[in-house]
Amino acid sequence: MNLQEIKNAIQNGSNVYWANTGYQVIKDNLDQYLIKHLSGYCIGLTWLDGITLNGKESEFFTI
């Protein structure tokens, strides 16, 4: 999934994951897209440039 596909899926109510179901992509109350681990640890979905994903496109998926 590319960045726009990930954002669209989340906006449409789908659950998006990275690498495995332990890492869910979320949109927080500040409209930031984050990769959140089950432990609560989060990183940004993208690098600071807002374009480059923190992961390969092929590693993002929906269930």
PLM features: residue spans?
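Mixed-charge, Lys/Arg-rich low-complexity intrinsically disordered regions
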Residues: 1-11
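Short beta-strand-centered aromatic/proline hotspots
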Residues: 22-33
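SH3/SH3-like beta-barrel fold
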Residues: 35-37
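Intrinsically disordered, low-complexity, charged/polar segments
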Residues: 42-63
